[in-house]
A protein has these predicted regions:
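Beta/coil-rich, acidic/histidine-enriched accessory regions frequently appended to metallopeptidases
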Residues: 1-165
Length: 165
């Protein structure tokens, strides 16, 4: 995507510490990468698509600047699913751009309602009450890192990945 940056630009090893309660188990891990982030925003029409064809460069400010990510998928003993997705960016400004774009996606593209701040820890919490994305989300910006927790319910956010403080 950015050939002039390689090999000079280092990648980050994004890690996700397991902070789930005994009712949840990690069932898989993967990296999504800049292309997946671009397509996520493109599908929700947050990236310009003048001819409705994705630009082959995949370059956009909402996804540029990613240096590493890790998604850990979880399943509960009752069969519910969720994930923790940590993204690391070149700078706090790049992280803020992705963070703010993701919050816009939750609010305006998939109908998320912002909840009051949680007493349990930092991060903005959203709930999508119906539709294909019906779930709860906690999105935390910390310097050059954005962590997204997805669970079937608001309570599930805390049991799947307890806030770090």
């Amino acid at each position: 995507i950015h050939p002039v940056r390689y090999p000079a630009t280092a990648t980050a090893n994004a890690t996700v510490t397991d902070r789930s309660t005994p009712g949840w188990s990690a069932v898989g891990t993967n990296r999504l990468g800049e292309t997946t982030i671009h397509v996520m925003f493109w599908l929700e029409r947050m990236v310009p698509r003048p001819d409705d064809a994705i630009r082959t460069s995949y370059e956009h400010p909402l996804s540029a600047g990613l240096v590493g990510d890790r998604l850990v998928a979880y399943e509960s003993v009752t069969g519910q699913q969720g994930y923790v997705w940590r993204t690391v960016w070149e700078s706090p400004a790049e992280a803020r751009e992705f963070h703010d774009g993701y919050l816009r996606l939750l609010r305006f593209r998939v109908g998320g309602d912002r909840l009051a701040p949680a007493a349990e820890g930092p991060g903005k919490r959203y709930v999508i009450r119906s539709g294909p994305f019906a779930d709860a989300f906690r999105v935390r910006l910390d310097g050059d890192t954005v962590t997204i927790v997805n669970a079937p319910s608001v309570d599930g956010l805390e049991t799947l990945h307890a806030p770090s403080g």
